[in-house]
UniProtKB/Swiss-Prot annotation:
Subcellular location: Secreted
Record's comment on post-translational modification: Highly N-glycosylated.
Domain Olfactomedin-like: 140-397
A cellular-component GO term for this protein: extracellular space
One Pfam family in the UniProt entry: OLF
Protein name: Olfactomedin-like protein 1
Name of the gene encoding the protein in the UniProt record: Olfml1
Keywords: Coiled coil, Disulfide bond, Glycoprotein, Secreted, Signal
Biological source species: Rattus norvegicus
Length: 402
C-alpha cells in the first residue's frame, strides 16, 4: 500500500525510511502513515509559532513607533510648560513689586490723609497735579495739526489689516511690516525703497516673535517692538528687535483691553502710539462707556506716568494718533469716507476743536485699520484695506499756555 506524502513531511518520511529495516509485516505502512501525520502536526505547530512571532514583532514595532511619537510630544509639552513657568515667574515678580508699591501707598495714605483735610489742601493737590502734567508734557514740541496735505500710496499687500512703520525713536531707515491682526511674523526692510520694490537686494529679514500680537496698534520705538499680547486683555510686550528676546511686559490698569476701542477696527483693543513725548496707549477704561482713555507710558521701565479720560467716543471711530501730546481721533460714517478728525484732546488744554479747521483725509473708500504719527519725519503712516499709505501734514504753533 502506497501513500502520497507531499512537501517536507514526505521528505522526512523518506529520509527515515532509508534507515529502517525492510518491511517485515503489513503493519509497517500504517506506522509510516502515523509518523507522517505526527510530522504534519509538528509542521503546523511550527508554522503557527512563526506566525505568532511575526505578529509579536509587528506589534512591538508599532509600539516602538507610538512610544517615539509620544516621547516627542512629551518633549514639546515640557518645553511649553518650562516657557509658561518662566513667564509666570516674571509676572509673579512684577505682581510682587506692584503689591509692595500698593502697600507703600497705603501706608503713606494712612499717615498723610485725614478726615480734617481742608479745601485749601485739595486745591494745592490739584495745582501740584497740573504742574506734574505740564512738566511731563513740557518739551520743545509746540505744533498743532492744521491739515492733511497729501497722500502717497507706498505699497499694496493682500492683508486688509496690519501695521507698518519706521522706528519712531531713532534715525534708522529700516521699515517694519506686520501683516494681519493676529500674527507673530515681522518683516524688516533696509529702507523705504527696499520696502516699495521687491527686486531690491538684500531682501527683507524675517523675525519670528515668541508671542503673537493682537490688533494693529503696534509701534517700534528705540529698537523695541511694543505690542498687545494676543490672548490677554491688557498685557503689553516689549520685544528687543536686536537681541530677539522679550525685554519686559506690563499690564495696563483698569478696563484696558476689555472692548475694541474703534467701532470700525474691531480687532484692535489697545492702540499704542509714539510722539515727541514718547510712548502712549489708547484704550477703553472702567466705567467709561464708549469713551477713549489716554495713558502715558515710560518706555524704559513700562511704568504708568499718567492717564486721562477723554471725551472722544469709540462710535464711528476708526483710528487715532498723537502729535505733540495731543490726541487726534479719526471718524467715518459706516466705515466709508469721508474720513475726518472730529475729536481732539489735549491734556494741557491748549488745543481745542474750535481752534482747528475741518481736518479731512484725502478720500479713501474704506476705513483705516491704523494711523500712526512718526515724530522723526513728521508724517502719518497708515494702513487702508491693504494699502500702505503716507500722509504729509501741515502744522502751526500752539497757543501759549495760560
Amino acid at each position: 500500500m502506497m501513500v502520497a506524502l507531499p512537501g517536507a513531511s514526505a521528505s522526512l518520511v523518506l529520509f527515515l525510511a532509508a534507515f529502517l529495516p525492510p518491511l517485515q509485516h503489513a503493519q509497517d505502512p500504517a506506522m509510516v502513515h502515523y509518523i507522517y501525520q505526527r510530522f504534519q502536526v509538528l509542521e503546523q505547530g511550527l508554522e503557527k509559532c512563526a506566525q505568532t512571532t511575526r505578529a509579536y514583532i509587528q506589534d512591538f514595532q508599532e509600539f516602538s513607533k507610538n512610544l517615539s511619537t509620544m516621547l516627542g510630544r512629551c518633549q514639546t509639552h515640557t518645553n511649553e510648560y518650562r516657557s509658561a513657568v518662566d513667564n509666570l515667574a516674571l509676572r509673579v515678580e512684577r505682581a510682587q513689586r506692584e503689591i509692595d508699591y500698593l502697600q507703600y501707598l497705603r501706608e503713606s495714605d494712612f499717615c498723610v490723609e485725614s478726615e480734617e483735610k481742608t479745601s485749601a489742601e485739595k486745591v494745592l493737590q490739584e495745582a501740584e497735579e497740573e504742574k506734574k502734567i505740564r512738566t511731563l508734557l513740557n518739551t520743545s514740541c509746540d505744533n498743532m495739526l492744521m491739515a492733511i496735505k497729501s497722500l502717497k500710496i507706498v505699497k499694496k499687500t493682500v492683508d486688509p489689516e496690519g501695521s507698518w512703520m519706521k522706528d519712531a525713536g531713532s534715525t534708522s531707515a529700516k521699515v517694519y511690516l506686520l501683516a494681519g491682526s493676529r500674527n507673530n511674523t515681522v518683516w524688516e526692510f533696509a529702507n523705504l525703497r527696499a520696502f516699495m520694490e521687491d527686486s531690491v537686494k538684500p531682501g527683507p529679514r524675517k523675525l519670528t516673535l515668541p508671542l503673537s500680537w493682537q490688533g494693529s496698534g503696534q509701534v517700534v520705538y528705540q529698537s523695541f517692538l511694543f505690542f498687545h499680547n494676543q490672548g490677554t486683555s491688557n498685557e503689553i510686550i516689549k520685544y528687543n528687535l536686536q537681541k530677539k528676546t522679550v525685554e519686559d511686559r506690563m499690564l495696563l490698569p483698569g478696563g484696558a483691553g476689555r472692548a475694541p476701542i474703534y467701532q470700525h477696527s474691531l480687532s484692535t483693543y489697545i492702540d499704542l502710539a509714539v510722539d515727541e513725548h514718547g510712548l502712549w496707549a489708547i484704550h477703553s477704561g472702567p466705567g467709561i462707556q464708549g469713551h477713549l482713555v489716554l495713558t502715558k507710558i515710560e518706555a524704559g521701565t513700562l511704568g504708568i506716568e499718567h492717564s486721562w479720560d477723554t471725551p472722544c467716543r469709540s462710535q464711528d471711530a476708526e483710528a487715532s494718533f498723537l502729535l505733540c501730546g495731543v490726541l487726534y481721533v479719526v471718524y467715518s460714517s459706516g466705515g466709508q469716507g469721508p474720513h475726518r478728525i472730529t475729536c481732539v484732546y489735549d491734556p494741557l488744554g491748549t488745543v481745542r476743536e474750535e481752534h482747528l479747521p475741518n481736518l479731512f483725509f484725502p478720500r479713501r473708500a474704506r476705513s483705516h485699520s491704523m494711523i500712526h504719527y512718526n515724530p522723526r519725519d513728521k508724517q502719518l503712516y497708515a494702513w487702508n484695506e491693504g494699502y500702505q499709505i503716507i500722509y504729509k501734514l501741515q502744522t502751526k504753533k500752539k497757543l501759549p499756555l495760560e
